[in-house]
Regions:
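Nucleotidyltransferase catalytic core that binds NTPs
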Residues: 1-154
């Protein structure tokens, strides 16, 4: 099984901070690849002034084109919107049976994990690599056996 990290986000736009975190997690964990999963619509975030979906996707592709350990994944462009992590990961498992997927998120996102669709199935079925955001606490799940806190540089 190829261990692949899924780094979800709006990437509005993708920036050096995203790339540093993705590269760091790839380099200092057991992940063989990190996929940047561009989310057209996050169900837990208000509608902000987002760049067009295709623009965000293209910028992400350009940002990682010279880094073979990072790949852009556009699966959520082909799924019903809004996109839910559980639906995306189940589809990816169906499409890529030779991979073990790990969910990458920041403590700013993970603090609301209890609001995610089917969070119980996610926490019991998948590993989470959570990178520390100094101003946010990982919440009640920080000590869960499925959660690994990563001290990534910011």
């Amino acid at each position: 099984m190829i261990k692949t990290g899924l780094f979800f986000g709006s990437f509005n736009p993708i920036h050096i901070g995203h790339l540093i975190i993705a590269s760091y997690i790839h380099q200092f964990t057991d992940l063989e690849e990190v996929w940047i999963v561009v989310s057209p619509k996050n169900p837990l975030k208000p509608e902000l002034e987002l760049l067009e979906e295709e623009e965000r996707l293209k910028m992400a592709q350009l940002a990682v084109e010279h880094n073979p350990s990072l790949k852009v994944c556009d699966i959520e462009f082909y799924l019903p919107k809004p996109s839910y992590t559980i639906d995306t990961i189940l589809r990816l498992e169906s499409d890529y049976p030779g991979r073990q997927f790990v969910i990458i998120a920041g403590t700013d996102i993970f603090k609301d994990f209890h609001r995610w669709k089917e969070w119980e199935n996610l926490i019991s079925g998948y590993q989470f690599y959570i990178y520390n955001r100094p101003e946010y606490d990982a919440g009640d799940f920080a000590n869960h056996p499925s959660v690994k806190i990563i001290k990534a540089p910011l």
